[in-house]
């Protein structure tokens, strides 16, 4: 097995003693400049989405609020997603925006009374005064199992303009590999919520055998990557294949069997507990909750193990996205009931891209 780098991370295919171990990379070697706080005082934020005008939208889990961060740095409430039921890890989760003709839609994944669901509603107004037309809410996908934990919740439009939805097993681990169960899956749907053309099982399901996926992003070649919470042993970074079975609950981490696809890299939960991910220059950035760090994995040089930056500097990290001008944005998550909030938490931070 490969030597551990910056913690207990293991890379797929690194069992040969002939492969040299790269030098450990410390956060001080790769992180540049001081962070810029773009927003402070956030309450259990979960997702951040940049807008074309330079602003952003931020979801707050427990209250269902969608906040607008304007390009000039002002923070205001755009609206509240109706029907959000919060409790435990459930509430308002991922956001995505789609423009079609003259319509601009906000998509949101949230907990409801009896399930998790994805809804959409028109995003109205101009930058600086955006609003949610909650009277025109449409259900895109419902019937996703909901529980106090393992709710998944990340949504993103792929290069094919289809909507990808990350779900958790909602504690029903025995059904994560069941194609007829929406939990423990990555779903792929049209913007209206129908099975996307070319789906492997002629259903909403794109991949299965997941425990709790919370990160989705694509490299430049169109490959989908996903982060996944493990149980007690291994968290995972997976390269997603259409129809792929990733083995949960029968396998966690590297199974090396014919009935499941192994992850590309794994971490112990105390060093990762991965949530949102981003791809910047074909490097995957993984936000760690318990790990309180960012993990980076260069998909163009798979023989090099992931390395960590900003370890312990900002507390729990929930989401990460590309920023402007060689920067990236990180959303902290210290007010979710499991962190130790600082005076300005939670925050949206802008950081300079690491070197090397």
PLM-predicted stretches and their roles:
Residues 11-13:
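C-terminal motif of bacterial Sec signal peptides marking the signal peptidase cleavage site
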Residues 15-172, 223-230, 271-307, 321-356:
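Acidic, Gly/Ser/Thr-rich repeat motifs that build Ca2+-stabilized beta-propeller blades
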Residues 205-232:
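Repeat-solenoid scaffold signature
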Residues 76-88, 135-151, 189-208, 244-269, ...:
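Surface-exposed loop and turn segments in beta-propeller and other repeat-based domains
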